[in-house]
Amino acid sequence: MPSFDIVSEVDLQEARNAVDNASREVESRFDFRNVEYSFELNDASKTIKVLSESDFQVNQLLDILRAKLLKRGIEGSSLDVPENIVHSGKTWFVEAKLKQGIESATQKKIVKMIKDSKLKVQAQIQGDEIRVTGKSRDDLQAVMAMVRGGDLGQPFQFKNFRD
């Protein structure tokens, strides 16, 4: 029986490349001359810390980072940025988290969405991924299109497609 897995992962090497590219772009920008700023990627906690001298500049740096992530194939919705920007001394910073895995509430929404579609497929939650099996390859492709089209707040990848 054909099957595939629905996962939500961010390639940390590509994220590191995007952070380096964003840092390189900011170095050459006139509006960031003589401004203290930094991008720090923490592999262990999967966070990106953006630091600058004002909250407006932090928002500009986040926009640059999102653009560079998108160029490297990482969707902007995989970056979870908190609303409040922290002020500490003369610097402002925000610690954005990269979404890895699918939360259980989102998993349940996806499984319910698949079951409500009345397609002849089964969906099973396995850890932080969802395995979808069915008799028809067309049904599985319909599920892929439905998950891509559903507004669930994070990007999904499809792996291990087997016939």
From Swiss-Prot:
Transmembrane spans: none
Pfam families: DUF520
GO molecular function: nucleotide binding
Lineage top rank: taxon: Bacteria
GO cellular component terms, semicolon-separated: cytosol
CDD domains the UniProt entry points to: YajQ_like (cd11740)
The entry's keywords: Nucleotide-binding
HAMAP family: YajQ (MF_00632)
NCBIfam families named in the record: PRK05412.1
Function: Nucleotide-binding protein.
Family: Belongs to the YajQ family.
Protein name: Nucleotide-binding protein YajQ
